[in-house]
Amino acid sequence: MKKPLQPTPEAVLEFAVATIETYFRIEALTRSIGGFAQAGGEWGVMKTLIYQGPHTVPDIARSRPVSRQHCQTIVNHLYEKGFVEFIENPRHKRSVLVQVSKKGRKHFDEMTALFLRAARDYAHHFNADDIETATTTLRHAREVLVI
């Protein structure tokens, strides 16, 4: 069996540019659907907390390509809305854990339903295999591109 051809640097750059362009369109869409500027970031932080359990702000930031300060801004905004709460961290006295509140879980589920409705509106433009391949490729790129 032949080894797949390695892409050219130009092709990898084009992939990166297309990813960035798509990201900004998706971000604009999530803002319009979520009704607030940080819709995607807030949803992403809550998703991390729901699926992985309580985290410190630095831990959340390390799992995403954002600064701790940016992540703290998102968490503070979620806290002001009552979507997350701070709990004692048995491993560290000064770095509290963040967890999603009941109100936050309800909000997350509502946002997810809105995002899924939008995804349904666009799904007919794609082939299922292409979406699966693109998702696999992007996840692989995320693992390879370590800063």
Model regions: which residues?
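N-terminal helix-turn-helix DNA-binding core of bacterial DNA-binding proteins
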Residues: 27-70
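Short, hydrophobic-biased segments on the C-terminal half of alpha helices
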Residues: 57, 75-76
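Charged, amphipathic alpha-helical coiled-coil/dimerization segments
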Residues: 77-136
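N-terminal positioning helix adjacent to the helix-turn-helix/winged-helix DNA-binding module
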Residues: 11, 22, 41-42, 103, ...
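Alpha-helical linker/hinge and terminal dimerization helices associated
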Residues: 19-30, 64, 107-123, 141-145
